[in-house]
UniProtKB/Swiss-Prot annotation:
Keywords: Glycoprotein, Membrane, Transmembrane, Transmembrane helix. The keyword Transmembrane helix applies. The chain crosses the membrane at residues 21-41. This is Small integral membrane protein 29. It comes from the Eukaryota. InterPro entries: SMIM29. Its main location: membrane. GO terms for cellular component: membrane. Glycans are attached at N3. The gene is Smim29. It is a single-pass membrane protein. It is found in: Membrane. PANTHER family: SMALL INTEGRAL MEMBRANE PROTEIN 29.
């Protein structure tokens, strides 16, 4: 009997493999979250800037809106219009399938 040992091949430590897999995953996830937050902040600033730009141009008066709606309704009553249905131009004279002339 000989007292020699067989050299073992070096095995990768499982903890280091986890680091090689999870490290890039968390790095990519972190970069994605940062990009999403930056895009959200830019969009919010753009919308706020647009709202502040357009707000002085628009003044809402509910009483004025009601008066305009009443005027539109009154003007529609005096102005008769002919309204055709969507089927009016597509209706054709239909011939019965079993039209037997005797």
């Amino acid at each position: 009997m000989s007292n020699t040992t067989v050299p073992n091949a070096p095995q990768a430590n499982s903890d280091s493999m986890v680091g090689y897999v999870l490290g890039p995953f968390f790095l990519i996830t972190l970069v994605g979250v940062v990009v999403a937050v930056v895009m959200y902040v830019q969009k919010k600033k753009r919308v706020d800037r647009l709202r502040h730009h357009l707000l002085p141009m628009y003044s809402y008066d509910p009483a004025e809106e009601l008066q305009e709606a009443e005027q539109e309704l009154l003007s529609d009553v005096g102005d008769p219009k002919v309204v055709h249905g969507w089927q009016s131009s597509y209706q054709h004279k239909r011939m019965p399938l079993l039209d037997i002339k005797t």
